[in-house]
């Protein structure tokens, strides 16, 4: 397809096109798309996945940033009345407004260099999807799915919105051009109810940034520095929340962070 249209993948856009048909079908299966679903596809590329989504979904909004690919994409999906192709940068668009209403499904092949920014943009939108199925670097997917003891800012920033899981590993050879690392299909099932209101969510992110500022240090020390209080005061507040002051940020689960936000809300 690229050769026929005299096009080359753009390194500056992190373009690696998923070309393995079996993998494409597995991604659609992981998304559990039905005829009642509205799908927002990010990074539609050459339309291989777009066509499969269009065959299953009620409607598909396919977003592609590369102006060169849009005419090709429109040609590939021209037989599908339920697919609309849009040219633009998803980071400059409102995903929820594109989808039209809550409960839509996001399917995306995300460039490695802006993975975190795109995930955050999709999760933080006011009009929430039901789930996201993302093709991302395997190592990043594993970090997002980490459990207490190995948690990170990235993992907590996703897990506060939904439950992540890895649906499958995608070998580098499934892409063109072939990247240096393997990828994974990451599925995020959004919680039906948010864990925090808007103010609490801001406090949560402020708190975890404090906790992970020096993640090898004990929480009594990182929170003392972040809240500008003494170590003894920080230890007392942690103990009041049922958290051992000598623990480190990566060992706390989401419920413990929520309890800690409630305990420290007067200082966050």
Residue spans of the language-model regions?
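Catalytic cores of RNA-modifying enzymes
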Residues: 1-210, 239, 243, 250, ...
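Conserved PLP-dependent catalytic core of the aminotransferase class-I/II
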Residues: 215
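Ca2+-coordinating acidic residues in Ca2+-binding motifs
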Residues: 256
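Short amphipathic alpha-helix in the helical subdomain of ABC transporter nucleotide-binding domains
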Residues: 231-234
